[in-house]
Amino acid sequence: MLRFILGLTALYLISVCAADVSAKSSKKNPTQEVQVTILSSNLANGATVGEWGLSALVEADGKCVLFDAGRHPDTVIRNAKVLNVDLTCVTDVVLSHFHFDHNTGLLPLLEDLRASNPKAIQRVHVASGFFLRRQYPQGDGFVDWNQMIDVRKKLEAAGVKIIEYNKPTEILPSIWVSGPVTRTHDEQKYGKARMLVDGKWVQDNVPDSQVLTILTDKGHIVLLGCGHSGVVNALEHVQSKIDNAPIHALMGGLHLFNASDEMLGWTADKLRNIGVQHLMAGHCTGIEPLMRLRTGLNLTRKTAVVGAVGSKFVYGEGVRPTSIAM
C-alpha cells in the first residue's frame, strides 16, 4: 500500500511539473522573424505623406497585423502603395485607443483590401472602454466625438469580429495586446474631455489605451499608439503582466511632445533603468523629446531614430530609418 501511495504521489508531482512547464512554454513562444513598417506618422519625405496620426504594419513569422490605421481616410493606403508594402495579408487590426487620428483609415482600408482579398481584416482588437460615449468641450457645451461607436456597426456588418480585452491576451503566436494598462505613475495629464461610465460623466483618461508587444528571444518589441497611459506604465505593465523579458525595441507615439524638462528627465531615467535597447518613436513623441531620450538612454543614431513614414524595425538588424530621419 505504501508503494502504491508513493507511486501515485510521484505521478502527481510529475504531472504538476509537466503542466507548469507546458504553461510557461505556451506563454513564451518567441517569434523569430519580425518587421515593423511605419505607414502613418508626423514626419515623411519623398512621395509619402505625413499626418498627425499613426499606423504600422507588423509582420511576424508570416502573420500580418496592422497597428492603428491613421488619421485620414487614404493615408495608409497611399503610403503603403508608395512604399510597395502589401497589406492584403492583414488579418488582424489592433487599435491602441479610440482617438480618430488612429482609426479613421480603417473602413476605407477594409474596402480597399477586401477587393483583392475577401479574407482581409477578419478581427479588430481593442481594450475595454474603447466604445464608451465620449465628449469634448465646444463653446458653451459638449459634442460627441467617439466615431468608433458608429464605425463598429459598419465593421460588424462587413463580418469583422470585434474583440474587447480587459487583460493581456495573446492574439496570435507571440503577439500580445496589453488590455487596459495599470497606471502606477502619474505620467499624463488629461483635459476637459469626458466619458460616460455607468450613467455618469467623468473625466476621460483614455482607459482603453493599450499596447501591442511581440515576444522574441531578445525580449519585447513594443508598439504604443499615443501612450495615454504613460510609456513607463505601459512597459512596466508589459513586463509584469505578460513576460518579464527585456524591452528590445520601443516604437510608436509616446505622448511627450508637451512634456516638461522634468518629466522628460524622469522618463529617460526610467526607460534607461528598464533597459530599452532600440527606440523608433514618432507621432506625438516630438522631435526634441526623442533626442532627449536618445541621450538619456545612452543610445545612438543607429539605435534611436524618429519613426518617420517608411521607417522600419527589423528583428536581428535594428532600426532602418528613412533619409529624413537619419
PLM regions and their residue ranges:
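Active-site HxH/HxHxD metal-binding segment of metal-dependent hydrolases
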Residues: 88-167, 179-189, 269-277
